[in-house]
């Protein structure tokens, strides 16, 4: 969206309120962490336009309560999240009804551009600058990042640990360096996977340092996580695992492949899967996808 905002209003001053200031690029004029102090500041400003693409109550309450000539996205009305106008209704309804969500053929980028009144034309992410970190990595090895977590909200998306081990071994045998990625939640698992597979694991880091680590990879294997967005923004090849979401929501900009289990499952948007369907995504398919993308 930043590219479009700067194109349409090149002289506009952009403010961004966020829970993750570290991922906001310097093109933004004022980056505000989500704190009471920042919210007080926002209440003292009259904006030309405010965009809220988040359906959480606190974000909707802010859009409803702040002063602006034009508002787009989602607001809080009598305690309920509602679309501000017709442009936000599609995204609102697909979030309520699974049948509509499954029928959706728009990527998330298309959806948010339309909510804001624009047409998506393949605009790339804009990433923050994260130089200054040094990594002890082999100079001549092609690095494949293996992001083994899936966040705490939807453990149904986790690929079996034994599959990560086998994939790492196959990548090593093919001459690549598998680098295990993850946060604090994956630390113990990644230590174990590194020991079992011979993959490299450097630890877990701050968000800015994690961005730098992902940038060292040529390809990233991941579920739908922060690492996916970082890999897209850093223009890496991606093998994306998906089992509970609509695959059409994800635009990998022609640099990746979406892989789903070879199993018809009804765990759509479910935090748990009674079939553990990710076990039906074979190591052979994932490895073949990696090799195919790395050959391009």
Residue ranges and their predicted role:
Residues 1-296:
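Catalytic machinery of carbohydrate-active enzymes
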């Amino acid at each position: 969206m930043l590219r479009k905002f700067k194109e349409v209003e090149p002289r506009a001053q952009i403010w961004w309120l966020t829970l993750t200031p570290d991922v906001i690029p310097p093109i933004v004029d004022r980056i505000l962490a989500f704190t009471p102090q920042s919210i007080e500041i926002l209440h003292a400003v009259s904006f030309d336009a405010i965009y809220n693409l988040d359906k959480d109550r606190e974000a909707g309450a802010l859009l409803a309560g702040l002063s602006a000539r034009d508002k787009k996205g989602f607001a809080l009305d009598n305690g309920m999240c509602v679309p501000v106008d017709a442009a936000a209704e599609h995204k609102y309804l697909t979030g309520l009804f699974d049948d509509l969500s499954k029928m959706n053929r728009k990527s998330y980028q298309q959806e948010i551009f339309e909510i804001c009144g624009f047409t998506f034309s393949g605009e790339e992410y804009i990433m923050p600058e994260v130089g200054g970190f040094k990594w002890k990595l082999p100079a001549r090895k092609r690095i494949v990042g293996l992001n083994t977590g899936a966040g705490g909200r939807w453990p149904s998306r986790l690929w079996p640990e034994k599959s990560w081990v086998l994939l790492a071994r196959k990548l090593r045998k093919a001459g690549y360096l598998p680098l295990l990625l993850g946060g604090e939640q994956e630390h113990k698992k990644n230590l174990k996977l590194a020991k079992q597979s011979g993959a490299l694991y450097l630890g877990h880091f701050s968000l800015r340092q994690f961005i730098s680590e992902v940038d060292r990879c040529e390809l990233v294997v991941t579920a739908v996580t922060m690492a996916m967005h970082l890999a897209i923004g850093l223009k890496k090849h991606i093998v994306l695992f998906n089992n509970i979401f609509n695959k059409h929501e994800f635009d990998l900009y022609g640099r990746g492949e979406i892989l789903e289990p070879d199993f018809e499952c009804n765990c759509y948007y479910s935090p748990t899967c009674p079939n553990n369907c990710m076990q039906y995504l074979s190591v052979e398919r994932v490895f073949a996808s990696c090799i195919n993308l790395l050959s391009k």
